[in-house]
Amino acid sequence: MNTNYRKPLPGTSLDYFDTRQAIEDIQPGAYAKLPYTSRILAEQLVRRCDPQALTDSLKQLIERKRDLDFPWYPARVVCHDILGQTALVDLAGLRDAIAKKGGDPAKVNPVVPTQLIVDHSLAVEAPGSDPDAFEKNRAIEDRRNDDRFHFINWTKTAFENVDVIPPGNGIMHQINLEKMSPVVQSREGVAYPDTCVGTDSHTPMVDALGVISVGVGGLEAESVMLGRASMMRLPDIVGVELTGKLQPGITSTDMVLAITEFLRKERVVGAYLEFYGEGADSLTVGDRATISNMTPEYGATAAMFFIDGQTIDYLKLTGREDDQVALVETYAKHTGLWADSLKTAEYERVLTFDLTSVERTLAGPSNPHAHQPTSELAKAGIAGPWEQEEGLMPDGACIIAAITSCTNTSNPRNMVAAGLIARNANKLGLTRKPWVKSSLAPGSKTVKMYLEEANLMTELEKLGFGVVAFACTTCNGMSGALDPKIAQEIIDRDLYSTAVLSGNRNFDGRIHPHAKQAFLASPPLVVAYAIAGTIRFDIEKDALGYDPDGNPVTLKDIWPDDAEIDAIVKASVKPEQFRSTYIPMFDVTKKEQAKSNPLYDWRPQSTYIRRPPYWEGGMVGEKLLKGMRPLAVLPDNITTDHLSPSNAILMDSASGEYLHKMGVPEEDFNSYATHRGDHLTAQRATFANPKLFNEMVRDENGKVKQGSLARIEPEGKVTRMWEAIETYMERKQPLIIIAGADYGQGSSRDWAAKGVALAGVEAIVAEGFERIHRTNLVGMGVMPLQFQDGTTRHTLTIDGTETFEVEGAVSPRAELTLTMHRANGESERVPVICRLDTAEEVSIYKAGGVLQRFAQDFLESEGAA
């Protein structure tokens, strides 16, 4: 921590760093023009940056330059159990590698406070119609995840600076919003803005509090944990003015789905957005958090709101200590982070969105930005006539209706609205269709408390929306098994079946293998679709049922009134609910425990936790990038779900066959996500998504075949993807992937990069990369290359029979040459952009990846190498 510009913070016993003065010393009047994001980035530079580099770094912010890397030091790391556990498995493996080289493994610890929340591993096996669902699902979770939880329990005592929130307590982002973020930190006698990275792409949810909080891959999180600065260049900072107010009956879900479509079209990929204006002022933190949560769905890095009266009200509502709330207000007003101080901020680009334009909305059938106003569902071909045969499910059957996800369960207005629509439906005798698997999985225990306080929990339970978990569940693809009779009918009749959920992602195949497509909706709409029973139902016009007098009941007859929603929220949501939930939860993590052995005792038969191989053989050092054959040629919009799916493992998959050989019963296969601590299981998930289109595999008419398929070259044999990977691994064949635009969008899972790296992929050439996945590729020693504008796999007529090599001096964003050697003997040289974006990334790449770099640097510092 530096000493220059450190001053007493008026009205407190703390100091602060006077960022305004530091900026004004370089350019008078500049601070008032800085956006909110730049002010926070500047503060941490003044506090932590090497004093000799400070002026040049601050000039990047003042002059809006992007030609110099500067450090970012996040105050905290938050992890969920999948990527967090994977990161800690990597650190445990790093300890083994250090010990093998003669270093002290006990010295490998996170130096930045790290919070791990177990929220991703519970599947909804018992539905919300089962009164014992919560207990049953938790028992199954514990049984299936014994190996994982054994390891996680070891980390509590083996590593310093790691807090673990055990399963059954809520979702990482909602806990971060409601409790973990102080908004303003106070450590070592200094107050400064809270900042955070998290191993999940929805980490920006806390941006709603004015906290820069961004999603990163597990590899980058490990780097931050170990105290390394995250090097960055000034991002694009885009102002988004929200005008008007939401119309009556419109939810924050409707708003965010409309905004997601709008921002996707405006191409804000990688940008930091700052929302302001009368519309932003009118939104509660619950509404703001819904927008910030879906940052990755519109491709941005952050979605900031300023600290204002709404922020203070929320901190009080969620039971923060009075002293902490006062500190947030004092600090924000004194340092120019209060909303009123941002009226002079200048943006290089400003977008405007009118909240009054928002209608009731679904998103689907395959993307969160596929915005569908409910008034136009018939026009869009989603709603339409269907035949209802006695005893059979209809076309478009809604087999899953899930109130799920921190995106929506963190907003009391949404949850109360769901309770009220259930109450109104129950009064009129409406019921859930029998084929609909319904569930309620709040991101916080407080949700159940205030629904009970409002007498709405029993209303939801009557319709089958009992609490199944306090975890991610269906939103994360952990929707659990269907009733076997329903699953068999879907197969036998080849039925088009769907899911409706209040989640944030609906990529094909994500929610359930039998839900061919999925739609995102507000919690009250999810309840309505459970009653309707099919996506073919025109939700605004068709009759949901008939009242006791035989009158048709439509959506407008049961939709709750805004005034009643607000009155119930005001009366039923109380600070003591948050305190009674979180004080005991965090007290558990603070109890002192005896230190564990610094080296983990790996279980050799485990299919969940295994010593990683990243410090061995070909995983170390820079790749040659010669003689590479394509593993796949891929279209636009390849997601990390395509690259490494998260949903249930089926027996006929490569991972399922492996687990069967290892003696795991099929009912305990669990999800792909839960096995990511074992590379032998997880690497078999690479490209295992049945919705994949590999353009190297075509039918006799030349049409691309769907499935986890590959073509082994040079013999041209079509196989399942894993068999192709195994074949190439045996041959020690270096591989390349050719792809379209927006490669790697979606979840921040590092296994989307680890899987291809272990398969032998040395480079990926695409028209564009999503930010987190590109960083993960670098972290695994895989070279990301970008075609120049106008060049694509189509213009180059790439068919997969080629071999490739890359030539040129590797440096940040350098132009390199991709040489294609065609099967007919011809060659073609193509300029490509090296997407190692910083000098630090070049250094990591040349070491073979971030984990290999850690080991090198640690041993050098210890003198053991």
Regions from the PLM with identified roles:
Residues 243, 276-283, 504, 722-770:
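Extracellular/luminal Protease-associated
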Residues 1-76, 87, 115, 608, ...:
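Acidic/polar, glycine-rich intrinsically disordered N-terminal extensions of enzymes
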Residues 547-562, 568, 572, 773-844, ...:
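Acidic, glycine-rich flexible loop/linker segments
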Residues 597-668:
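Segments forming glycine/polar-rich beta-alpha architectures that bind adenosine-containing cofactors
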Residues 50-242, 253-257, 360-363, 377-471, ...:
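Long, structured ligand/cofactor-binding scaffold of large enzymes
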Residues 37, 187-329, 337-338, 414-417, ...:
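Mobile "lid/hinge" segments at catalytic clefts and subdomain interfaces of large enzymes
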Residues 73, 91-147, 274-275, 280-385, ...:
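Terminal amphipathic helices with adjacent charged low-complexity linkers/tails
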